[in-house]
Structure formats: structure tokens, C-alpha cells
């Protein structure tokens, strides 16, 4: 008995890959913030003020990035925190904020403070740790963008010039 000849070509299968959505660079995030900051009429009606703490609302999210609105009464602050490996940018639309930038938990770094006035945008990479504060006497409103969307944030305290990790919050806990 003769067996039929098979002409099936052997195929090599490519290794399985995980598709990771492209992320935006700090510069691209700053551009997204700028676009929203110049059109407050499109979102200003959503802003609220809260004496209990900063008010915030996520106004955009997709696989690449997310955007938040945040309002700040005088004296409100974030405390030192990172962005869980996400890059970011923020811009002040109304009022003024003050940003205190620190190093990393592994590296001692002098804290630097810089004013961020209306119209100014700050952008940063994925290992950035900072504390943003409203040290003025007026309300402030800011726009924040992160890529990839925030999955977690770690909070820190500055003790004797070194960052000490306090806790990590996952998305949905804030």
C-alpha cells in the first residue's frame, strides 16, 4: 500500500508576544495638557471645590493615557508620591501651585521647590517623586495627564532628608 505524499510545508510559529499599548512621552503628555488647558470652557463646569481635600475627576482614559482635573483650595497638598511607573505632566490653568521635587527612595536628593503659575506645564518621567501644594491664598485648578494610565501610586514621607515609603495605593483607591 502506498501512502500519499504530503506537501504540507512546515511552519515556524512566532513566539507569543504580549501587546503593550504605546505610551506617550512626557513631552507628548505636556502637549495633551496644553490642549486642555487652553479650552477651559469645555470642562470648567465639571470642577468642584472640597474643603475635605483636593477634588479630582478623571475626564479621559484609554490604553495609552489618562487625564485628570484637580482643584486645590489654599493649603491643600498631595504629599510626596510617585506615579507607579507612569510618566506625567501637569499644568496650572487657574491660580498657582508649588511643586517640591525629591529624588528616589534609593538616592538621597535635596528637595527643590518651584512655583508653577497659571499657563505653566511641568512634565516628568516614570521615576519622578514630588509633592504639589497650593501655598497661595487663592483657589487653583490644574490638568494632569499620565501614561500609561495610573495603576498605582506610592506615598512617601521626608524624614531627615531621606524619602521613607509609607504605603502604595492601587487604582480605584483614590
Q: Where are the language model's segments positioned?
A:
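Short beta-strand His + acidic residue motifs that chelate non-heme Fe in jelly-roll/DSBH
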Residues: 79-81, 99-100, 124, 130-135
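N-terminal leader/capping segments at the start of a protein or of a new domain
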Residues: 1-41
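Glycine- and acidic-residue-biased ligand/ion/polar-headgroup-sensing regions
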Residues: 74, 85-103
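Conserved double-stranded beta-helix
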Residues: 145-174
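A short glycine-rich, His/Asp/Glu-containing loop-to-beta-strand
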Residues: 45-76
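Ligand-binding loop in jelly-roll beta-barrel domains
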Residues: 117, 126-152
Amino acid at each position: 500500500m502506498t501512502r500519499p505524499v504530503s506537501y504540507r510545508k512546515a511552519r515556524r510559529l512566532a513566539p507569543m508576544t504580549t501587546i503593550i499599548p504605546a505610551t506617550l512621552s512626557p513631552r507628548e503628555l505636556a502637549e495633551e495638557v496644553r490642549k486642555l488647558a487652553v479650552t477651559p470652557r469645555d470642562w470648567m463646569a465639571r470642577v468642584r471645590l472640597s474643603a475635605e481635600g483636593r477634588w479630582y475627576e478623571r475626564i479621559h482614559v484609554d490604553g495609552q493615557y489618562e487625564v485628570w482635573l484637580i482643584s486645590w483650595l489654599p493649603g491643600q497638598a498631595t504629599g510626596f508620591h510617585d506615579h507607579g511607573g507612569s510618566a506625567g505632566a501637569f499644568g496650572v490653568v487657574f491660580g498657582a501651585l508649588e511643586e517640591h521635587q525629591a529624588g528616589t527612595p534609593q538616592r538621597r536628593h535635596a528637595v527643590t521647590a518651584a512655583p508653577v503659575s497659571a499657563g505653566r506645564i511641568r512634565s516628568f518621567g516614570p521615576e519622578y517623586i514630588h509633592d504639589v501644594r497650593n501655598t497661595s491664598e487663592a483657589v487653583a485648578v490644574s490638568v494632569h495627564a499620565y501614561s500609561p494610565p495610573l495603576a498605582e501610586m506610592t506615598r512617601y514621607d521626608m524624614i531627615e532628608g531621606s524619602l521613607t515609603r509609607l504605603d502604595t495605593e492601587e487604582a480605584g483607591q483614590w
